[in-house]
UniProtKB/Swiss-Prot annotation:
Protein's recorded name: NAD(P)H-quinone oxidoreductase subunit 4L, chloroplastic
EC number annotated for this UniProt entry: 7.1.1.-
Organism: Manihot esculenta
Classification via NCBIfam families: PRK05715.1-2 (NF004320), PRK05715.1-4 (NF004322), PRK05715.1-5 (NF004323)
Record-stated family: Belongs to the complex I subunit 4L family.
Catalysed reaction equations from the record: a plastoquinone + NADH + (n+1) H(+)(in) = a plastoquinol + NAD(+) + n H(+)(out); a plastoquinone + NADPH + (n+1) H(+)(in) = a plastoquinol + NADP(+) + n H(+)(out)
Keywords: Chloroplast, Membrane, NAD, NADP, Plastid, Plastoquinone, Quinone, Thylakoid, Translocase, Transmembrane, Transmembrane helix, Transport
Membrane topology category: Multi-pass membrane protein
Keyword Disulfide bond: no
InterPro entries assigned to the protein according to its UniProt record, in alphabetical order: NADH_UbQ_OxRdtase_chain4L/K, NUOK/Mnh_C1-like
Top-rank EC class of the record's enzyme: translocase
Amino acid sequence: MMLEHVLVLSAYLFSIGIYGLITSRNMVRALMCLELILNAVNLNFVTFSDFFDSRQLKGNIFSIFVIAIAAAEAAIGPAIVSAIYRNRKSIHINQSNLLNK
């Protein structure tokens, strides 16, 4: 694939993730949009690493690091959401003001 096609795809994924993160009122949907943003960033890292210097794997290694961070976020995020649901009986972002109690 050409560089422009991959960058346009990554920009679309990033834009969809940002739009979903801004407009979503559901915490689970916000976590999914955050994962979409991280995957778009990973696609950029791998693409630029392959396009500019294919012998050095700095972009690929950094992409694996971001995948590890996303895996930790995917493990901890739903646990936090379930704890908030248990205490507040809602997973909507507007209804869960954690500073009041």
